[in-house]
């Protein structure tokens, strides 16, 4: 009797266990299928630009499963994509492939190989109806500005060196200290204010430190006066003064399309047309669920142990669940962005200019820069009887330029192209408009404080979150810097700890216009960052060189 009762109890326990397990499976799936207990992916990566795809490729090569979510339904590459229109290709923003990091240079070669071309570099500045070589050539500038204006520029420069603005905070103060007030007004003020839509007094000196710190008057004079010698090693070429650069045969998007295919071949997913609407963090498992809206508004969920985000920081903070503190939300809403659009004009080949691009320092036209895509790569233009120009206009999303009809913008571009003497409006046979929201994170007086607040909130509330790239970090990174942040983030994931400080990439502002190709090693950026209680940002303590 006792043994029979024991048997009944065991059968009852087994039945209850079966019912509970079945119920759990119906509600939550098997334990191994539960995204919070066993994420399907090592990382969910938001954005298929240079940062997102570099991280995906690095992790995939190490056998890790990843999924990349890209909002664009057609192109990968982000701002580094190539847009095609009737066989003509447009580089959104212009991308010279030249890096201080040897590893980045090698990675480009690994991805594209023989499809990387070596192209001549040529840029000019348009000022008062005259074209000046860029970087400036002193003797040319002397002859074109005139003796009197040149003398005033020299006096202004000497005065700035003798009495510099102490502790320059704004872009204007920084540039005046380096070049003098007169050269600032001639060659910096108009174009910079077009780009940012704000006074140079309101732009942080950080922008100047990143973009032009290596471009000094002395360097320009030395480059103009000394005979040029072809360097034995490409590593020794200073980027500001380079004569050539590498470029994908069909534009920068060719690089990232090839990279996406490599990720897929290694077992990763790269999904287009997925707009992320929520990023949910589970503190118990330290895992992430990312919700994206796909075709026809259908919501999909993607699960991963880590989240790598290159989406705009403002957007990420608003989408994180559980909700971040109000201080972080307010700081995120205070971050600003500058948008731009490219008017692509196809015109008959008559008096084509040979430069890669020309900066338009003329307040009488709205265009900021004009690109000649045939000078980037002849294969960007399918018909040799035509040329293709890209006119760049800087604006804010929703303003008058942004909302103009495409036909009106094309007419404006043709008119202004003729106005600056780069082509005849009558020669324009076709055109298109490409709009790029959030192209540039704005460096205003308060951006560092806001980024610091956000970083502290994310560090306190969100483990396994990695910010990479230009908009992901609200940091004006060039393409190669975005790639380096992604490589370091991927290596932190592989190491299981934050060994590398992605925030130290480009922190000193030395690289963007003063780097030497391939001179640094990416892997040397050790990370030991701690919050600085006396400031609104982190204080990185680094060791080694940075890529």
What are these regions (language model features)?
Residues 494-546:
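Active-site-proximal substrate-binding core of FAD-dependent oxidoreductases
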Residues 51, 74, 314:
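Conserved Rossmann-like nucleotide-cofactor binding loop
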Residues 54, 152-155, 159-281, 285-288, ...:
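Active-site/ligand-binding neighborhood in enzyme catalytic cores
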Residues 86-163:
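Dinucleotide-binding Rossmann-like beta1-alpha1 core, especially the glycine-rich loop
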Residues 294, 304-306, 310-484, 491-504:
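C-terminal segments that line or cap access tunnels to active or ligand-binding sites in enzymes
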Residues 60-82:
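Glycine-rich FAD pyrophosphate-binding loop
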Residues 41-67:
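N-terminal Rossmann-like FAD-binding beta1-loop-alpha1 element of flavoenzymes
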């Amino acid at each position: 009797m006792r043994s029979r009762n024991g048997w009944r109890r065991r059968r009852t326990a087994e039945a209850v266990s079966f019912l509970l397990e079945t119920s759990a499976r119906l509600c939550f799936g098997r334990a191994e299928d539960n995204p919070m207990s066993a994420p399907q992916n090592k990382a969910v990566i938001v954005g298929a630009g240079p940062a997102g795809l570099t991280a995906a490729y690095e992790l995939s090569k190490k056998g890790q499963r990843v999924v990349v979510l890209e909002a664009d339904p057609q192109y990968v590459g982000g701002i580094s994509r190539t847009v095609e229109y009737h066989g003509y290709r447009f580089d959104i923003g212009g991308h010279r492939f030249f890096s201080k990091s040897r590893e980045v240079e090698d990675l480009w070669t690994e991805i594209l190989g023989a499809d990387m071309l070596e192209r001549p570099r040529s840029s000019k500045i348009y000022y008062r109806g005259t074209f000046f070589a860029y970087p400036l050539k002193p003797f040319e500038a002397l002859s074109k500005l005139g003796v009197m204006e040149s003398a005033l520029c020299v006096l202004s420069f000497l005065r700035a060196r003798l009495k510099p603005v102490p502790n320059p905070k704004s872009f204007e103060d920084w540039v005046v200290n380096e070049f003098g007030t007169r050269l600032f007004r001639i060659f910096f003020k108009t174009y910079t204010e077009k780009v940012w839509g704000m006074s140079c007094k309101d732009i942080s000196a950080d922008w100047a430190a990143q973009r032009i710190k290596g471009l000094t008057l002395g360097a320009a004079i030395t480059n103009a006066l000394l005979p040029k010698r072809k360097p034995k090693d490409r590593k020794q070429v200073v980027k500001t003064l380079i004569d050539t650069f590498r470029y994908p045969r069909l534009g920068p998007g060719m690089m990232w399309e090839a990279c996406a295919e490599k990720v897929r071949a290694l077992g990763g997913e790269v999904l287009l047309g997925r707009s992320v609407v929520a990023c949910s963090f589970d503190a118990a498992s330290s895992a992430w669920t990312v919700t994206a809206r796909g075709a026809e508004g259908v919501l999909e969920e993607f699960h991963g142990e880590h989240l790598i985000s290159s989406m705009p920081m403002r957007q990420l903070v608003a989408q994180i669940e559980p909700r971040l503190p109000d201080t972080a939300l307010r700081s995120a809403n205070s971050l600003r962005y500058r948008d731009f659009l490219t008017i692509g004009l196809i015109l008959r080949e008559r008096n084509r200019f040979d430069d890669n691009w020309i900066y338009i320092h003329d307040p009488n036209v709205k265009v900021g820069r004009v690109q000649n895509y045939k000078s980037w790569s002849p294969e960007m233009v399918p018909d040799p009887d035509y040329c293709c120009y890209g006119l760049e206009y800087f604006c804010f999303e929703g303003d008058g330029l942004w909302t103009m009809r495409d036909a009106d913008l094309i007419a404006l571009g043709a008119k202004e192209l003729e106005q600056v003497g780069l082509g005849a409006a009558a020669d324009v046979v076709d055109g298109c408009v490409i709009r790029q929201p959030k192209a540039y994170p704005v460096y205003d007086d308060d951006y560092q404080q806001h980024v610091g607040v956000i970083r502290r909130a994310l560090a306190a509330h969100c483990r396994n979150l990695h910010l990479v790239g230009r908009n992901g970090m609200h940091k004006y990174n060039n393409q190669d810097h975005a790639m380096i942040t992604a490589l370091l983030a991927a290596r932190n994931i592989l190491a299981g700890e934050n060994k590398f400080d992605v925030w130290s990439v480009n922190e000193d502002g030395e690289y963007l216009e003063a780097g030497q190709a391939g001179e640094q090693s990416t892997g040397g950026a050790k990370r030991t960052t701690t919050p600085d209680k006396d400031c609104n940002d982190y204080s990185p303590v680094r060791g080694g060189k940075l890529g």
